[in-house]
A protein has these predicted regions:
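Generic start-of-chain signal for non-secretory N-termini
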Residues: 1-6
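Repeat-mediated protein-protein interaction surfaces in helical alpha-solenoids
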Residues: 9-28, 48-58
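Structural register within alpha-helical repeat arrays
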Residues: 39-40, 74
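Residue at a conserved register position within TPR or TPR-like alpha-solenoid repeats
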Residues: 43-44, 71, 78
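Conserved structural position within tetratricopeptide repeats
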Residues: 61-62
Length: 79
């Protein structure tokens, strides 16, 4: 049983953000899956950082160009 799932999720999200920043700046090229990009987009959207959320959506769509979920996330950001 997990001791504190909220804390583990928060730490996992923090690690995803770090990996995303490295990918964005061309440092070490970690693989981020489609779900990771969705979480990153949601993170920046919740922080009201729409330009960064849009960049994350674009990077996600570069790696997963046929992802309906990422297309919908991007469309939601544009509304």
């Amino acid at each position: 049983m997990r001791e504190n799932p909220y804390r583990e999720d928060k730490e996992e999200l923090r690690e995803l953000i770090i990996q995303y920043q490295h990918l964005k700046h061309g440092r070490s090229h970690p693989f981020l899956d489609e779900d990771a990009f969705e979480r990153i987009i949601d993170y920046y959207d919740e922080k009201d950082d729409l330009p960064e959320a849009m960049i994350a959506a674009e990077l996600g769509l570069e790696q997963f160009p046929y992802s309906a979920n990422l297309m919908i996330k991007k469309a939601d950001l544009l509304l």
